[in-house]
């Protein structure tokens, strides 16, 4: 990157050059995984704090492993056992972060925009690991990196995103980045979960038959986010699976057409996807996990915290 970037808060703030730098750098990072020593001293002496206000296993662990492989010191800030539960305000938390003089803060919060607030008031580099239903930039980067591995030229490739678009920060960030890289994106899901006011220009389908006729290259499944739904948006998990899930019957067609399957995790087996599909040779879910570490290493490596006095 020609100009130092302090934070990664969303995809829209990245230039095309920055996007390609982050994706291109993830390749050499991934090559480290095959070495006997999987660490480099790039961030030796730097401190990384994970600040998660929502439960997370995959994203948090991925960032922690990424930081450790760059030789950074990692501190896990567990909100349930922290002062936040005792009434500490966001302003107090920010002041604490400044006093601790950490170099990087990985933050996930249930309120959209909170990572931006922290970034404005701290010298640390802030990475948005998911804020409400707004953005999840590192997931978007790892998804596009994964697709680039199976399609060296992603331009014109078609990605069908299936499920709860309305509540999904993954759908917002991932669809935006895919379109910027020249991919075509379409949505499939219940009308109640596919917003019509957003994502202008993206085709919407109501059933898999329509979607298959669009000739997708990748089926990207989203988790049904019951915790973000104030009221039920579909009758039952069983009904959802029947209409929008990758069932064994649909897997036959997916396999026959050589389509790839992706999912940001965690997976609801029997809802979005059947057990058999998890073992399908073109299921990229485990590769997404591996690539998440490489992409997050690239993100941390390319961010530049402000000097603290």
Curated annotation (Swiss-Prot):
Which residues are involved in binding L-aspartate?
86, 169, 223
InterPro entries listed in its UniProt record: Asp/Orn_carbamoyltranf_P-bd, Asp/Orn_carbamoylTrfase, Asp/Orn_carbamoylTrfase_sf, Asp_carbamoyltransf, Asp_carbamoyltransf_Asp/Orn-bd
Which Gene Ontology cellular component annotation is one that this UniProt entry carries? Answer: cytosol
**GO biological process terms on file:** 'de novo' pyrimidine nucleobase biosynthetic process; 'de novo' UMP biosynthetic process; amino acid metabolic process
Its UniProt pathway annotation is: Pyrimidine metabolism; UMP biosynthesis via de novo pathway; (S)-dihydroorotate from bicarbonate: step 2/3
Q: Where does carbamoyl phosphate bind?
A: 58-59, 108, 136, 139, 265-266
**Disulfide linkage:** none
User: What molecular function terms (GO) are annotated for this protein?
Assistant: amino acid binding; aspartate carbamoyltransferase activity
Q: Which domain of life is it from?
A: Bacteria
Task: Give one Pfam family.
Answer: OTCace_N
Q: Which reaction does it catalyse?
A: carbamoyl phosphate + L-aspartate = N-carbamoyl-L-aspartate + phosphate + H(+)
Q: What is its EC number?
A: 2.1.3.2
* Alphabetical UniProt keywords: Pyrimidine biosynthesis, Transferase
Q: How does it assemble?
A: Heterododecamer (2C3:3R2) of six catalytic PyrB chains organized as two trimers (C3), and six regulatory PyrI chains organized as three dimers (R2).
> Which NCBIfam families does this UniProt record tie to the protein?
asp_carb_tr, PRK00856.1
Q: Which family does it belong to?
A: Belongs to the aspartate/ornithine carbamoyltransferase superfamily. ATCase family.
Q: What does this protein do?
A: Catalyzes the condensation of carbamoyl phosphate and aspartate to form carbamoyl aspartate and inorganic phosphate, the committed step in the de novo pyrimidine nucleotide biosynthesis pathway.
This chain belongs to the protein called: Aspartate carbamoyltransferase catalytic subunit
Species of provenance: Akkermansia muciniphila (strain ATCC BAA-835 / DSM 22959 / JCM 33894 / BCRC 81048 / CCUG 64013 / CIP 107961 / Muc)
């Amino acid at each position: 990157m020609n100009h130092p970037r302090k934070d990664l808060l969303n995809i829209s703030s990245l230039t095309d050059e920055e996007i390609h730098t982050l994706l291109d750098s993830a390749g050499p990072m991934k090559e480290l995984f095959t070495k006997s020593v999987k660490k480099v001293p790039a961030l030796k002496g730097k401190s990384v704090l994970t600040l998660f206000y929502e439960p997370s296993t995959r994203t948090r662990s991925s960032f922690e492993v990424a930081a450790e492989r760059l030789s950074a010191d990692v501190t896990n800030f567990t909100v349930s056992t922290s002062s936040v539960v005792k009434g500490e305000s966001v302003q107090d938390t920010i002041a604490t972060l400044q006093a601790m003089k950490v170099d990087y803060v990985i933050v996930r919060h249930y309120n959209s925009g909170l990572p931006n607030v922290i970034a404005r008031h701290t010298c640390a580099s802030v990475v948005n690991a998911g804020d409400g239903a707004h953005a999840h930039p590192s997931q978007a980067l790892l998804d596009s990196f994964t697709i680039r591995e199976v399609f060296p030229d992603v331009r014109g490739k078609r990605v069908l995103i299936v499920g709860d678009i309305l509540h999904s920060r993954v759908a917002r960030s991932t669809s935006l980045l895919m379109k910027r890289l020249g991919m075509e994106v379409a949505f499939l899901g219940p009308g109640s979960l596919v917003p019509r006011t957003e994502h202008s220009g993206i085709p919407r389908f109501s059933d898999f038959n329509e979607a298959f006729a669009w000739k997708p290259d990748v089926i990207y499944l989203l988790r049904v986010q019951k915790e973000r739904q104030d009221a039920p948006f579909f009758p039952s998990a069983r009904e959802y699976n029947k209409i929008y899930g990758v069932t064994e019957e649909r897997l036959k067609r997916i396999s026959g057409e050589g389509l790839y399957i992706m999912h940001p995790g965690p997976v609801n087996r029997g809802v979005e996807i059947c057990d058999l599909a998890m073992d399908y040779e073109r299921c990229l879910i485990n590769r997404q996990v591996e690539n998440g570490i490489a992409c997050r290493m690239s993100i941390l490596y390319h961010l530049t915290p402000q000097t603290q006095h």
